[in-house]
Amino acid sequence: MIKAFLHSINSVFLTHAIFIPFLIGIFKWKKIDSKFHPFIIYLGMGCLAEFLGYSLRTNGLLTPIVSNTKNFLYSWMAGLFLLEFIFRFNQSQNFRSIQLIFTVICWLILGIEYFILGLDQYRASFVVVFSLIFLIYFELDLIIKLVHHAQLRINKKGLFFILLPMLFFDIFYLIFSILCFYTDHYKIDTLLSNLQFGYIVYNFFTYLLFSIAILWFSKKINYLSQ
C-alpha cells in the first residue's frame, strides 16, 4: 500500500521536492559563499524543467519531440552550471575549456542522432547518458580530492551533503536511463517499476539533504583550504 501511495504522488515528489532547496538557496543567496551560486542556479533549472514538464503533460502538449528537446536542453545547460559549481571548488584553471568540450560533444551527439533518426525519432538519449557519465567523473574526482585533504572535517562540511547524494543520484539515474533507453521494457517491466519507486524515494531525500547543506553554508569559506 505504501508503494502504491508513493507511485500515486510521483508528480508531487518529482515536481515539488526540488523547490525546497532552491527556495532556501534563493532566500540565503546573499549570505552564502558565491561558489555555491551555480548550484542554486542548477536547482532553479531543475525546478523550471519539472514545472514545464508537468504543465505540458497535464495540458496534453508533452509530445515526444517536445519532451526530447526539453531533456536535451536541461542535460546540456544544467550540466554547464553543475560543472562550474564543481570546478569552483576543484580550483582548476581549465574548467572553461572542459565546459566548452562538454557543450561541443553534447551538440555533436545531438546532431548525429538527429541526422540518423530524424526529428520524429531522436530521443536525446545519448546526450543524457553522456552528460551523466561526464558529471559523475568530475563529481567523483572532487570527492576524492576532498577526502584526501588532511584538514577537511567531512561531517562538518555542507559540500559533502551535496556531492555524495548527487553522485549516487546521478549513478542511479544513469542506470535507470540506460535501461529505459536501450532495453525491451516489456521484459524488465517489474525491474523498471521497482527502480522508479527507488528513484522517487531517493530523489525526495536527496533534495532534503541539499536543503540541509544550503542551510549549513556560511559566507566566504574556502572548503579546500580549511
Task: Enumerate the predicted regions with their spans.
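Terminal, non-globular segments
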Residues: 2-226
